[in-house]
Amino acid sequence: MKVKIKGNSKMKYAQIRKFDVTNGPKVRTTLFVSGCTHNCPQCFNKDQQSFEYGEFLTEEVEEQFLSYVKSPNVHGVSILGGEPMQQLMDDSLLKLLTRIKEETNKEIWLWSGYTYEEIISNPKRKEILEQVDVLIDGPFKAEMKNLSLKYRGSENQRIIDVKKSLKEKKVVLINVI
């Protein structure tokens, strides 16, 4: 069952990368959402903190994004921001992630300034998380910055296997070398 964005989405996005090799393993299609209230010091996406930044995620944009994801060259999807877990003004992000899983079954990675524990305690955020395969959680902390870390910026951030964590009811980390 296709669950499409109907009408006007309230969610804005800052950027789409058709082929991205920096935000996750292998070649990915990446969506940067707009809007974040964490205001992490030294945030590298300051312009994307405004919920007014960027363009609305329309039906046409959703279809274009999915066409990129369906490319045989694309291994998975990365969702960053802004803050994906603050996109609760409507269900546009949830619908997009659901379509990605239903139509492509490709791996979804999501970066959030919230911890896993904070996400699962909020029903709307948990519903989004249930569509995700890998979560990079926690706010960027400048005092814990480590440029040698893969896929994250500070040592407090974790790379979490979401499916195993939900099933086992405890955080299951992925060791990325």
What does each model-found stretch correspond to?
Residues 93-109:
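Surface-exposed amphipathic alpha-helices with a cationic face
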Residues 58-62, 90-98, 122-126:
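Charged helix-capping and loop-helix junction motifs
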Residues 87-98, 145-177:
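P-loop/Walker A phosphate-binding loop and immediately adjacent motor/lid segment at beta-alpha junctions
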Residues 32-39:
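Short pre-active-site segment immediately N-terminal to redox-active cysteine/selenocysteine motifs
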Residues 66-72, 76, 82, 90-94, ...:
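Extended interfacial segments that mediate partner engagement and assembly in macromolecular machines
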Residues 16-18, 63-65, 120-123:
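A generic local structural motif
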Residues 2-32, 45-52, 171, 176:
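N-terminal [4Fe-4S]-dependent radical SAM core
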Residues 45-60, 72-87, 105-119, 129, ...:
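Core AdoMet radical
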